Amino acid sequence: AARGAGDPHRLAAPLAAAGRAIAPALLALTLVLPFLPGVGRYEIDLGILVLTYVMLGWGLNIVVGLAGLLDLGYVAFYAVGAYAYALLALNFGLSFWVCLPLAGILAAFWGVLLGFPVLRLRGDYLAIVTLAFGEIIRIVVTNWVSLTNGPNGLSGIPRPSFFGLPFSMSGEPDTFAGYFGLTPSPLHRFIFLYYLILALALLTNWVTLRLRRQPLGRAWEAMREDEVACRALGINITVTKLTAFALGAMFGGFAGAFFATRQAFISPESFTFIESAMILAIVVLGGMGSQIGVAIAALVMIGGFELFRDLAEWRMLVFGGTMVLIMVLRPRGLVGTRTPSIALGRRRTIDASLVGEGR
């Protein structure tokens, strides 16, 4: 049967083509942003914030967009990564480059721990359990005062250096500016942090795109569409779900470690349900399963919050109204089609004259 004009599958090719056209231009702009005329500390810091949410969105996109597992407690892994880095750096003196993978591994471990109890849950029940998990982590870091300093948070978290070269204004030979013969500037650290989170975000994107075309990625998409059919086909649902939770949590842990080193201070108030809702909104607005859509949504949402900062209490109303309008006009998100990464070719009818004996 012919597909209707409004069928989302008819839009898959144009949207994919648009995404392929936008992505290189967006990447090129991102790469040169710190060196564009008129760009200063505020713009670079805003870029860092946007890229942090892009990375978080891509991490959650694995769980929600590809595997179809509604996770309302993703901020828990963000918190685990942040506190893991802070505690390792403060208590053991480990460098950022050592703590970063450890924070990701620890967050992935908690992702697996969350995954086991919810293996048989779907939809609303899964959402409730993940929401509770996110709140449990926040309550634990709030009340475990001897370890996390409770609601007062952890301060004095070490900032990363450029492979042993600190970003100091002294200009000494053993500093970043002195080693490269540059005039000391506070912008150097911001530019370094900008490219650091950009590299982490691109790593997240590269791993996700590679996995989507692997058997594991196809299993995620198949499970998203029909879990019962997946079981009938012999797909190991347990492994498929746990890997989605673990990988999504790992990237959330990386982002959390970066957040801790960027802020040099963390507290439980930074990891509330509002953060989970914001990240989920980015994934839904961009289009579940769409990498470029999530990036555009993060830019629109975080940039929009800054744009309407002067509206104070009204900006949430503007944000909510805009979200409703976009969801009415684009129910599948800005660049969302939910088409599989690898699909069978289009079926064609065969003329009856070509079917016969000897042909």
What is the predicted function of each stretch?
Residues 1-52, 82-102, 135-223, 231-247, ...:
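Membrane-water interface segments at transmembrane-helix boundaries in multipass membrane proteins
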Residues 3-6, 59-65:
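C-terminal ends of transmembrane helices
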Residues 51-59, 109-110:
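Membrane-embedded alpha-helical core segments of multi-pass
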Residues 57, 111-112, 256, 294:
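Conserved kink/hinge residues within transmembrane alpha-helices of Major Facilitator Superfamily
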Residues 61, 86, 115-116:
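Small-residue-mediated transmembrane helix hinge/kink sites in multi-pass secondary transporters
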Residues 62-81, 120-126, 265-272, 291:
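Short, non-helical or kinked segments that cap or interrupt transmembrane helices
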Residues 93-135, 296-298:
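Alpha-helical transmembrane segments within multi-pass membrane transporters and channels
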Residues 226:
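Phosphate/pyrophosphate-binding loop motifs in nucleotide- or prenyl diphosphate-using proteins
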